[in-house]
Amino acid sequence: MATTARPPLDARPPWVVVINAASGRQEGEAIAGFIRDALGEAGIQGSIRLVSHAEEIPGIAEQAARQARERHGILVGVGGDGTLSAVAAAAIRAGAAFSAVPGGTFNYFGRSHGFPEEPQAAIRAVLHGELRPIQVGQVNGQVFLVNASFGLYPQLLEDREAFKRQWGRSRPAGEHFRQHPLFH
């Protein structure tokens, strides 16, 4: 497969950042401030979109990806694996460079690519890193970075997310599974 040579990040292309404010520890505002400061210190132009509702991420990522391509910049996703997959998919469709700042709960993508666990350290790593190709997968037009799931498992994940929205993270997960139709 042919690859396109990309300049190192030290060439200072602008950043277009999409942050999922609800990811991980829900520190979106603080991370946005850190990115603004880091970009300013590095002399890099940037725009930041802080997204409060996860369902808005794909549309906002598409707009941001077009902006990144037009500015010859980098589309940077900040959030969990789902956020990063949505932002990467938008970058692929737009033909924009993509980078990630893992900021979710599990951060499988970040761990598999050697990103630091703390978002501030990951941001510094991206500032001083180089662009390089990564492997992505696609099933039925859906891009994924870590894995794709079929059958019961994705339904359980959707149910878990709905449960967390309704009851919060502190309720025992066992209560949810005890009431799930599969177990009746």
Language model: regions and residue ranges:
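Catalytic core of DAGKc-family lipid kinases
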Residues: A42, V51, I92-A97, V101-H184
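Short amphipathic alpha-helical segments
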Residues: E29-I31, V87-A91, R111-H113
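ATP/NTP phosphate-donor binding region
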Residues: M1-L75, S85, A121
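A residue-level signal for conserved active-site and pocket-lining positions in enzyme catalytic cores
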Residues: N20, D81, P154-L156
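Beta-loop-alpha module in the N-terminal Rossmann-like domain of NAD(P)-dependent dehydrogenases
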Residues: P58, V78-R93
